[in-house]
């Protein structure tokens, strides 16, 4: 390991977190110029204002910063495919997202020699909380309460409870395990699908991929958390939706490519599926003419289920731990497998 390490921060980051990174080791030099980065629109906004464009002078400064970097905290999507050229010293990138596999593949960086580490684990609790919110909103018929409130109508009704319902989870990584934990606290029956059939805490039964339809037929709630890979693309289509209960709820906090969206819309419109909570859709931002906006049994989240005010602090903690490991020539955590894409 060299005596000095230059880090370029390429995403908006609060000053206290920049200071935390600088304090990891005296051998570290941190390059951070907020004025050449997009202005964040909300806490932990890693892409910033989409209308932002660098001036020629700002672009030169940005490229000069990357040219010096041994390590980068996140990546700028406008300079991803050419990253090995403009940042020839770059050895490692710490991403601020968990699901970066497809992005790295599309940029042709899987064989670049650059190590990518992800923010895996940071978003587990917020995403699980989103699933819990969606399940309770449907069980307690939040929309009926909202309609009655708007009409100033007081009329008692009966809801459902989640106890004894079957929660099916596709993808039992950190997020899936957190969702399973929430389900068990509500005394739900929890089942899951994963590549390995090894037991998982809080999961009553593990299904193999060949048993997908069997699992779907049991599900009262289906949560999609698996990464987008060639194996998972389109895994929930017309045939899969057809075997689900008409009373079932589908929650997608993974990637939109896992679901055949037109088939999902038809199932919701025709009453073959009770509802959906979608943090991801095929076109983001969701266009005004999408039928999803008008479906009363759909929750739309603008890809924000994982975003909380504490996010940057948690990502910084992972990065700082990895910096200590990197300087000590120890294995990094959350390393992206550029072949499996997760």
Give residue spans per PLM region:
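N-terminal glycine-/charge-rich "phosphate-binding" loop or analogous flexible N-terminal tail
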Residues: 1-71
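NAD(P)-binding Rossmann-fold cofactor-contacting core
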Residues: 35-40, 185-202
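Phosphate/diphosphate ligand-binding glycine-rich loop within oxidoreductases
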Residues: 67-146, 160
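Short, conserved loop/helix-junction motifs that constitute active-site signature segments
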Residues: 82-89, 106-112, 241-246, 267-271, ...
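Glycine-rich NAD(P)-binding loop of Rossmann-like domains
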Residues: 115, 145-178
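Oxidoreductase and adenylate-handling cofactor-binding alpha/beta cores
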Residues: 128-144, 185-188, 317-330
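Rossmann-like adenosine-cofactor binding region
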Residues: 196-291
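Rossmann-like dinucleotide-binding domain for NAD(H)/NADP(H)
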Residues: 247, 253-342
């Amino acid at each position: 390991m060299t005596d000095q390490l230059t880090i370029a921060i390429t995403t908006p980051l609060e000053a206290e977190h920049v200071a935390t990174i600088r304090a990891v080791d005296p051998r570290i030099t941190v390059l951070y110029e907020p004025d050449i980065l997009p202005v964040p629109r909300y806490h932990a906004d890693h892409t910033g204002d989409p209308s932002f464009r660098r001036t020629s002078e700002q672009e030169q400064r940005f490229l000069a910063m990357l040219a010096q970097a041994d390590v980068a905290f996140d990546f700028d999507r406008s300079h991803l495919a050419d990253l090995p050229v403009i940042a020839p010293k770059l050895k490692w990138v710490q991403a601020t997202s968990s699901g970066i596999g497809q992005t790295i593949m599309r940029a042709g960086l899987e064989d670049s020699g650059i190590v990518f580490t992800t923010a895996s684990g940071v978003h587990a609790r917020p995403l699980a909380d989103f699933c819990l919110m969606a399940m309770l909103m449907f069980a307690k018929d939040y929309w009926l309460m909202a309609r009655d409130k708007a009409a100033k109508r007081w009329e008692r009704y009966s809801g459902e409870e989640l106890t004894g319902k079957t929660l099916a989870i596709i993808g039992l990584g950190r997020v899936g395990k957190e969702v399973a934990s929430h389900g068990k606290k509500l005394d739900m029956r929890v089942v899951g699908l994963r590549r390995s059939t090894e037991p998982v805490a809080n999961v009553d039964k593990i299904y193999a991929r060949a048993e997908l339809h069997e699992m779907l037929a049991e599900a009262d709630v289906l949560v999609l958390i698996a990464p987008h890979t060639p194996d998972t693309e389109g895994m929930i289509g017309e045939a899969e939706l057809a075997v689900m209960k008409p009373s079932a709820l589908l929650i997608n906090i993974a990637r939109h490519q896992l679901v055949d969206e037109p088939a999902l819309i038809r199932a919701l419109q025709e009453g073959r599926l009770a509802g959906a909570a979608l943090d991801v859709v095929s076109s983001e931002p969701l266009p005004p003419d999408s039928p999803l906006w008008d479906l009363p049994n759909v929750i739309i989240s603008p890809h924000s289920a994982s975003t909380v005010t504490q996010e940057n602090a948690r990502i910084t903690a992972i990065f700082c731990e990895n910096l200590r490991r990197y300087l000590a020539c120890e294995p990094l955590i959350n390393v992206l497998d550029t072949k499996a894409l997760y």
